[in-house]
Amino acid sequence: MLPGLALLLLAAWTARALEVPTDGNAGLLAEPQIAMFCGRLNMHMNVQNGKWDSDPSGTKTCIDTKEGILQYCQEVYPELQITNVVEANQPVTIQNWCKRGRKQCKTHPHFVIPYRCLVGEFVSDALLVPDKCKFLHQERMDVCETHLHWHTVAKETCSEKSTNLHDYGMLLPCGIDKFRGVEFVCCPLAEESDNVDSADAEEDDSDVWWGGADTDYADGSEDKVVEVAEEEEVAEVEEEEADDDEDDEDGDEVEEEAEEPYEEATERTTSIATTTTTTTESVEEVVREVCSEQAETGPCRAMISRWYFDVTEGKCAPFFYGGCGGNRNNFDTEEYCMAVCGSAMSQSLLKTTQEPLARDPVKLPTTAASTPDAVDKYLETPGDENEHAHFQKAKERLEAKHRERMSQVMREWEEAERQAKNLPKADKKAVIQHFQEKVESLEQEAANERQQLVETHMARVEAMLNDRRRLALENYITALQAVPPRPRHVFNMLKKYVRAEQKDRQHTLKHFEHVRMVDPKKAAQIRSQVMTHLRVIYERMNQSLSLLYNVPAVAEEIQDEVDELLQKEQNYSDDVLANMISEPRISYGNDALMPSLTETKTTVELLPVNGEFSLDDLQPWHSFGADSVPANTENEVEPVDARPAADRGLTTRPGSGLTNIKTEEISEVKMDAEFRHDSGYEVHHQKLVFFAEDVGSNKGAIIGLMVGGVVIATVIVITLVMLKKKQYTSIHHGVVEVDAAVTPEERHLSKMQQNGYENPTYKFFEQMQN
């Protein structure tokens, strides 16, 4: 019986995995899906062979909006009629992720949750209902929520019936990845636990798996991109630096031995974190010790949703795991966390965890314990290497607190309306107005707290980027000052410094793009500041690269590598700017009325006009060769003006030599007052090019429009007057002109006829004829 049931379940699962909508898609082997992992090119399912393929354009990476995900599905599957997207129920392991600008793809897998690209008219999933399981469904026509919300509703409904959620699917789409209901299958706890135990027994011989991170997580995370652009910057920056350290090819053997590969270190940390119990310890003591530990994110920066047992609350709570390190109080699901830790803790905690939670099934549960000082705690804590994780937790606590307060107000509102049924109409309106004002006040307060949280996070990220850039610049200068200087070491330090500057520029552009999407007016206000900051970055890079010419022997040896490095960075910059400035943005609602950056008259050009980016462009005042720089055995030469001829009038801080160079002198760029107050400026050779609107031409256009308007108004008035006169002259009111040559009797007869006189003779003959 059991083998037959297993074969039946396997066949049904295989049929569902290969199931695709039948809207003209006969012959497809797999369902259209896309997967994203920040820092790597997007992947999509090849519907012809059932394998994952990399992004065909070689430029698209993680997308942070559902509209963008839908558009990307339509781009990679142009022959299919993609109408919607929905997050998959289960994560998958995908290998061979490619990085933008790199030819070779890494072989180690990443664990992500893909998005299903729905084809044609929406059709609900066919769920398999095993024996002793129940099929349930919930619909709310007044609710339009995400996949995560309905998954939570299904899980809580099964928990209330003392069952486990076996499978689920969405019902009644109402937007992009939003639905009005869910269908799900609940199975008894005993059978689910048997299935879990059998699966664990096949995969691992140990009695208890403590939820530690596998090596597959060392460099990856689940692909849930739900935050705005600035919330992901720290994770992306640190992951990029880790990958850059892997790809660096140091020429010095000592450095290669000293520097440890990133993934080997994370694998060793993971293996230490997942060490099982020794034979001398009892299982209960170890479980109690593990479940009493605090949640740890770890040194990595992935954002994997996990659960840990909170001793103070007596239940499992969610947190974000970095992907490596941490401790063993780390579980995939809330059910598994409670199964391991709930039975091993004290009886009081056990009773607390076994009490059913009376929650509204259509309300999102609180994802983190809310405290009154949730934001204050984050603001008072100084920033550190775990800034992104701290920001995520603070944001979750803030949202949880806001949801709790809104729920409390709504309950009070319902109770007040129930009590005010018999009150006069004026009193009912007063009650409604009172609670409306209260809700608006809570919304405004939450918005202010969110803004304060984001601004603090942005400031800390900028400070972190500045510290890294300063450290990279100091290492670069130290490498140049070494006696004798090692060219390979100098190049590696220069490469890290250039990347640090590029990270700063990327962060600035990403922040500006986010502000432009959220608040176009504020983006227009900060545009000049962004442009000035980008120009300062290029000035600083020019001055730093000019130091390389003070050591001509090193400059000659690493010429090709530096050209290749700068060309690669320039190509990446072209892609970033093309995506952020030129790429059209699909939006829904009022956001679609926002003007595109490319439609404005202000032109932003952050790159050279000719598209080339090499050391010669950054150093037009020098050419490679030993003859171009006078020899100096002590490496003390006069500093070179690292700017084009048009900018050499700008004052800079003088320096006495390479040995006296300070980081602050290079990072500080002074601008002439006339340059700063000018309405527009233009800088070539990797400088910012900014064309402001011509104020004079605008005034002339306005005057011309005013004169034209006056002329048109005058013509209209004259035309109306003439028409009115013509209308008056055409009215006769029955007056008949009389010839002056007629006799007085005839004139008198005409007047009598005008006054109604009728000749009796004529009247007599008319009556006779009638």
Swiss-Prot record:
Q: What mutagenesis or variant effect is reported for residue 728 to A?
A: No effect on APBA1 nor APBB1 binding. Greatly reduces the binding to APPBP2. APP internalization unchanged. No change in amyloid-beta protein 42 secretion
Q: Where in the cell is it found?
A: Cell membrane; Membrane; Perikaryon; Cell projection, Growth cone
What mutagenesis or variant effect is reported for residue 676 to G?
A: 60-70% zinc-induced amyloid-beta protein 28 aggregation
Q: Which parts of the chain does the record assign to the membrane side Cytoplasmic?
A: 723-770
Q: Which segments constitute the BPTI/Kunitz inhibitor domain?
A: 291-341
Domain E1 span(s) in chain numbering: 28-189
Q: State where heparin binds.
A: 96-110
Q: Where is this region: Disordered?
A: 194-284
Consequence of substituting residue 665 to D: In a patient with late onset Alzheimer disease
Name the residues that bind Cu(2+) 1.
147, 151, 168
Residues the record lists as Phosphoserine modifications: 198, 206, 441, 730
- What GO terms in the biological process aspect are recorded for it? adult locomotory behavior; amyloid fibril formation; apoptotic process; astrocyte activation; astrocyte activation involved in immune response; axo-dendritic transport; axon midline choice point recognition; axonogenesis
| Listed GO MF terms | DNA binding; enzyme binding; growth factor receptor binding; heparin binding; identical protein binding; peptidase activator activity; protein serine/threonine kinase binding; PTB domain binding
Look up what happens after changing residue 684 to R: Only 23% zinc-induced amyloid-beta protein 28 aggregation
Q: What is the effect of changing residue 743 to E?
A: Reduced NGF-stimulated neurite extension. No effect on APP maturation
Q: Quote the annotated effect of residue 717 to M.
A: Increased amyloid-beta protein 42/40 ratio. No change in apoptosis after caspase cleavage
- Return the InterPro entries for the record: Amyloid_Cu-bd_sf (IPR036669), Amyloid_glyco (IPR008155), Amyloid_glyco_Abeta (IPR013803), Amyloid_glyco_Abeta_sf (IPR037071), Amyloid_glyco_Cu-bd (IPR011178), Amyloid_glyco_E2_domain (IPR024329), Amyloid_glyco_extra (IPR008154), Amyloid_glyco_heparin-bd (IPR015849)
In its UniProt entry, what is this protein called?
A: Amyloid-beta precursor protein
